[in-house]
Amino acid sequence: MKAYINRTATFAWSPATYESDSPLIATGTVAGALDESFSNESLLELWKPFYAASADANIDADAKPLASISTSARFNRLAWGYANPSRPKGLLAAGLENGELGIWDADKVLAAAAESDAQVIKNTTHTGPVRGLDFNPLQPNLLSSGAVAGEIFIWDLNSPAKPYSPGARSSKLDEITSLAWNCQVPHVLATSSSSGYTVVWDLRGKREVVALQYGGGAGTAVGSLGINAGSALAAGGRRGMSAVAWHPDTPTRLVTASEDDSSPVIMLWDLRNSRAPEKIMTGHDKGILSLSWCKQDADLLLSCGKDNRSICWNPQTCDIVGELPSSSNWSFEVQWSPRNPGMLATASFDGKIGVHSLQSTNAPEPDAPATQQLNEDSDFFNQATAPQTTSKGLSLKQPPKWLRRPVSAVFGFGGQLVSSGGPSSKPFTPTVHLRDFVSEPSIVERATKLQHALDGQSLAEFCAQRSQDPSTRPDDIANWKALQTLFRADSRDELVALLGFSKEDIAQKVSQSIAAFKTNGTAAVEPEVTPVTNPIDEPELTKPVTSADDGADAVEAANEIVEPAAIATEPAPEVEANDIDEPGLFGDDAAGAANNDASDFFNQISAGQTPAVRSALPSHLLSESQPHIHSSAATIGSPAPSSVASESIRPSTFKIYPSEESEADKLITRALVLGEFESAVSLCINSDRFADAFLLAVRGGEELLAKTQKAYFEKRTAQLPYLRLFQSIVSDDLTDVVQNADLGEWQEIFVVLCTFSKQDEFSNLTEQLGQRLEFQYSLARNSDITQAKEHRKNAVLCYLAAGKLEKVAGMWIDEMKEEELALRSNTKNADESHKGTLYSARAEALQTFMEKITVFQSAVGYVDVDLQQPTQDSIVAETGARSYKLAPLYDRIHEYVELLADQGLISPALRFANQTPADYRPHGPADQSATATALKQRLLKAEIARPKTDTAASSSTNNVVAAASASASSYAAAPASNGYAPYDPYGQSTSSSVPTVPSVPAVPAVNTYQDPYAAAAPSPSVAAPQPPTQSRYAPAVPAPVPTAMQPEPVQTNAYGAYGAQSYQSAYQPAQPMIPAAPAFGASSYGQQQHQQQLPPPPPLKRDQSGWNDVPEGLAAPKRTPSAMSQHKSANAITSPFPNAPAQAPSPYGGAPGAPPTGPPRGATPSRGMMSPPPQGPPSGPGLAQQRVGPPGVRPPPMGPAQGQPRPGQQQPGPPSQAAPSAGPYARPPAGPGAPSANGMQQQQQPGAPPVGPGAGALRPPGQALPGAPGLAGPPGVPQRSATPGGGAGAPSRSATPGARGASQMKYPPGDRSHIPENQRPIQHALQREVARLKATAPPAQKRMIDDTERRINLLLDHLNCGTIDAKTVGGLMQIVAAIEARNKQAALNIHLQLVTSSSGDVAAGLVGVKMIISRL
């Protein structure tokens, strides 16, 4: 209750046109009731309710009315209306109990005028109490009144002297209880009577239109039947109608209320079908006394009655939408406020008029207890009758129309905008619209371009575009150029060029410098040496050579004797060869002579003279035309003249020990003569003659050269700075350059690393350089912003070259913040209303950041090891306590995922979400710290619920994860460390159903299939190429399960990735000392030509797994294999001699240990070449095979016949010496725990080729798929026929059902571009889980994982071709969601539902899915 008036009175609200800050209420003392004062006085009062914040019982006890006038009689009805310029506050009309109609001027009443002055009309036309009174809402000057005996008068207040009658008095009316004007048609009036009728009048026609009556179960329109009110039918159905009200919007609808306590109903009538009420509302316990229909909202109807209740209804639905607190006595009147529909008032006989608000905020108080402890002196009757007031307000179940939004909208996850709206006539049946909402189209465009670049592997071009984009910040241009260089093979050279360094430029500058030296004569020339004039005495030449020790002493003595001035201490300058004067090579002229001047030759040429050309080489080596002059030097002491033509003895001949030679030179010469290079080098070094030292050290060996270099660097590094750098380069100690070189020359340091560092050292060295630059950045960021940014840019370049994502991410985050601030600043300067663009600035900066991160990951192939090492501790995973080195990057990825999702890019968002650990919890507010798993689940749900659309935004995100995982390596394989649990075989029987097989394909098969159960294999680089898809009937993973539960899928070929043939086993046994099953890969040589000539095989019947299995007593005992012995136990017996060495591979492809392969193409095996029976009963699985194995089938003349064994069959006995080749389609060995196959499971079919008697040979291989690798398996051992001649009539197996599925595929295997966008989560989740299995599975189970991968690829092939039904796709989506959530049980339940209704390739693929689920 908002307010109340202490009066037992009828009331009326001031009209809507009344101008006041708050509405007024007029009250008139009600007739037939007494108040607390027991006064007989009748008052007309005007009130302004005090709207208190609380409804305490005494808050309005002393409230006084604004005006009060005494009247001659009490009031039955009070109405307030007809406000006009002459009477702005309107007129107050009252129906009194004495039959008088009184009308007062409200303005005069408020002015406290005398009663005679305030009353406008006082009419006594009515003969009885006036209980009906209403102003016409469309013509306010008309006032209707009703009294006893069906009296109805219409008053024109402009001339109220004489009233008008609506027509002839109706016989169906007695006392008029209520009347109401139609809200849409001004001349229609409805009147209700105590007789039980409600009559509708047409005042224009002055006639009764219709009379409505409620007869107990339905209303009755009796006006047209001429039934009188006093008739039996009418008398039996009389129930007084206490109130009537018109629909505020529809002129043909109205409601009536019954005051009968036995049938307190409200009837909704439609005059177009007036024979029965349209609806009946029940809820009151006793008769209803008043109705009020809200003019502003037709869905709100008030009623009150004898049960002390005031109820708010929705007449459209007949529901109670609210109820006021009950009064302690009858509530006899209720009205909506005309001006403020949120206010309403009720009057009751408990002496209060309550004013209520629909927006009351008062908290409800607890109800008083039913019984209270009474004091001894208390008055029982006073307490029993005390009014109980509560503060409980009216609370509606539905919003009123003026508060109801005509259109509502809300943003949904995934860029969805949900809006609802509808016509005002049907507010509760609105139309719901679901729209894609893109608030940042530039982000969508850029994200789409990024995805296109990833899909098209054109990220280098993407970098070039970003670096040339005018919108790119200058700081980012260097980043994009550096990123572009990382995609090139010679990225180091590109980085060097990016910094402005060029070898060509250096070479050009050196050439220019040399030319300048020549022109200016500034090149230093070695001092001329005085020529030898006196020969050395002969005794000097004949001196005995000292020993090594003596020579060392002599060297030391020379070091002491030689004066420093006599030894060149300055380094010899580098000069051109043309500038060096060597007089000993140009005749006997002394050095420095006039004709020996270095420029004399050129001077003679310029003077036109032609001097005699003399060569630096001896003339006897130039020409034989000169006269033979024998060299005296060559012939002295010779028994015969020398045969070598020589010039005569010239002064150019030299002495080994010239006289003017220093003692140090003599010692060097002596050491050289003896080959003592180390001593000579030592003397040269001590004499600072490093050029001579290096020449001698080169002849002395690498060790001496290294010592010479070290000594040279020690002495000369301080004088020549470039030697410090060269020393680091020569000694492979670039760490010294990185750590000690001045950072002002960081570019030179970086170029040195790019030029000289080793591949395995480059990353660490550039990281160290980046760390030095980053440290300078951290120091300068608070003082010199410009210098700090320069250091950061340089550090980013170093980290990019080093491939350190964790380093560069932090610095790019700083750049992102700066870019965001810059965008905000630009926005503020451009437009003051920038509040809505803060999100855009953040989005733009974040998009740039993620573009750089994505491109960088793809360029360097970054591997995030945290993704490969999931958290093992469940508590740590739940709390998010694990620390990650890329945590800041993960936070930005989560933010970017939400940004993409907000723009409707669900698939790209899901791909980026997968680049964070599953248990990572972003840092931020609690409501935004959902783990990566929760975010993925939400994205998956949005992806599943999203309709299939081929929009540009969605099509551009087809292969985000595929590209990102291949390049960014978020899911790249990491070294495995965990064990591998035995495979749960649940769900393997799903592939037992086999469809009909088509005819033989015309395209030749290619045998590249790998045996998933073969022994350990070499690296994939040695093996045959992996096929992109797998056989849907590839061998199931073995497990220790009962025989009846084992599937019998038929193997077939998968598509070959390449067209090459496999001529030998793709995998060789890892341990030849152990009898191992030969791997798949038997020769396909000799098949490609004749396969096309074979007739179509007969159709294959469906096999029902387990219906005719071998009894468990005959089967070999099964054991659960261990991780170490699993590959051993799966090997079949391939030789009767266990200790025999493995055979070499057959030239036709037979695996080691396999029987001789079949003849080459064109050769026909002899009919007599049948396998002999085994020498002894084999043990183990072979025994069961021999007992129940199928009869052998002899191969046809043109190579292997059609057929395919089941993967669950064990290998039979030892091979024959002339058995046909196992071929690429022989069945694989049975795994540990696999059931013994029953030979009778294969149904007999007519049309088999004839066979000879005796033991049967291997089952012939089946037809290969076009371009598919064959199922190269180990050769089978011949089986003993169960009956003589049992091989006769055995049918050849037709081509596998996989051939039919493959031939019908619209797109080639491995293609994933046609997978619908809403099904992309299936592809990426399965590929990601397969990558996880490959990374974590031990090597012993590699073939099992490969088999799972082939099954998944086959399933994805069908998904790409659109051959999987919608129900299965939906189930796969649910499985993917469960896998992402790591909900193993839910995934198993969904998988069970799928496998029970799937067959063919889908069933085979689901086996791979089951493998993934089992490893969660």
Curated annotation (Swiss-Prot):
Residues 1015-1024, 1140-1149, 1160-1170, 1200-1211, 1233-1246, 1256-1271, 1290-1299 have a biased composition (Low complexity). Residues 1171-1180 have a biased composition (Pro residues). Keywords: Cytoplasmic vesicle, Endoplasmic reticulum, ER-Golgi transport, Membrane, Protein transport, Repeat, Transport, WD repeat. It is a peripheral membrane protein. PROSITE patterns: WD_REPEATS_1, WD_REPEATS_2, WD_REPEATS_REGION. GO terms for cellular component: COPII vesicle coat; endoplasmic reticulum exit site; endoplasmic reticulum membrane. GO terms for molecular function: structural molecule activity. Residues 1015-1040, 1078-1317 are annotated as: Disordered. The COPII coat is composed of at least 5 proteins: the SEC23/24 complex, the SEC13/31 complex, and the protein SAR1. SEC13 and SEC31 make a 2:2 tetramer that forms the edge element of the COPII outer coat. The tetramer self-assembles in multiple copies to form the complete polyhedral cage. Interacts (via WD 8) with SEC13. Belongs to the WD repeat SEC31 family. Component of the coat protein complex II (COPII) which promotes the formation of transport vesicles from the endoplasmic reticulum (ER). The coat has two main functions, the physical deformation of the endoplasmic reticulum membrane into vesicles and the selection of cargo molecules. This is Protein transport protein SEC31.
